[in-house]
Amino acid sequence: MAKGQSLQDPYLNALRRERIPVSIYLVNGIKLQGQIESFDQFVILLKNTVNQMVYKHAISTVVPARSVSHHNNNHHTAPTEAVENVETQAE
């Protein structure tokens, strides 16, 4: 596993496993919402009324609807707080 994914994979997996709704902001400003169904090195499969395959290189930010606890290399990481009013960042 690449060093850059040592945080990314456990974080995305916690969001997937706990079925936490997420807002995904793309680099072009578009906001997508749904639950992470699956992911790999290059894409995230986002489920809402339809499934969308989102390429990671197009993603700016992933914002969970609530805090999530995740583990990184068997070390517990403090819960990540959901960001409120993130829409102002995209404007």
UniProtKB/Swiss-Prot annotation:
CDD domains, per database record: Hfq
GO CC annotation terms, alphabetical: cytosol
Keyword RNA-binding: yes
Sm domain sequence ranges: 9-68
Function, in words: RNA chaperone that binds small regulatory RNA (sRNAs) and mRNAs to facilitate mRNA translational regulation in response to envelope stress, environmental stress and changes in metabolite concentrations. Also binds with high specificity to tRNAs.
Source organism of the structure: Haemophilus influenzae (strain ATCC 51907 / DSM 11121 / KW20 / Rd)
Family named by the database record: Belongs to the Hfq family.
HAMAP family: Hfq
Subunit-level organization: Homohexamer.
UniProt-recorded Gene Ontology molecular function terms: RNA binding
Alphabetical GO biological process terms: regulation of DNA-templated transcription; regulation of RNA stability; regulation of translation, ncRNA-mediated
Gene that specifies this protein: hfq
Keywords noted in UniProt: RNA-binding, Stress response
Transmembrane spans: none
Name of the protein this chain belongs to: RNA-binding protein Hfq
Residue ranges of the region described as Disordered: 69-91
SUPFAM superfamilies cross-referenced by the UniProt entry: Sm-like ribonucleoproteins (SSF50182)
InterPro entries listed in its UniProt record: Hfq, LSM_dom_sf, Sm
